[in-house]
Amino acid sequence: MPTPVHRWDEIALEKITEMISRKIVTGDREMLAQTYLKRGAQVPMHAHDSEQMTYVLQGALRFLVDGEEIIVKEGEVLHIPSGTPHQAEALEDTFELDVFSPIRADWLAEP
């Protein structure tokens, strides 16, 4: 079976809110999300079974992870263990990549 190559420019941008949009690629056990957050965008407190790595390519995010405030800036990576409550706010217009393992099945089920 050939190894699939995904092109971000061929993946539809999914509008989550007026302030947040994303593109998703999935494998068998992991998911990669390209996420765009406008300054002031809020990701509410939540937790999931997936381990998460967030790599900020441009901008900055303020996270609250299990009660600890963490600022993640361009070029930095945040690891969030599975099951850990967290929320985020975009301090600037932000472009970031999220890796989830296992796949966030709840994201695939969304309309």
Describe the predicted segments one by one.
Residues 1-29, 33, 109:
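A short, N-terminal "cap"/entry segment at the start of jelly-roll beta-barrel domains
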Residues 67-82:
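Short acidic-glycine-tyrosine-enriched beta hairpin
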Residues 50-61, 66:
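Glycine- and acidic-residue-biased ligand/ion/polar-headgroup-sensing regions
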Residues 57-58, 73-74, 92:
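A cytosolic small-molecule/anion-sensing beta-strand core signal
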Residues 33-47:
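Conserved short histidine dyad/triad with adjacent acidic residue
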Residues 82-106:
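Ligand-binding loop in jelly-roll beta-barrel domains
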Residues 31, 60-62, 69, 85, ...:
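Structural motif
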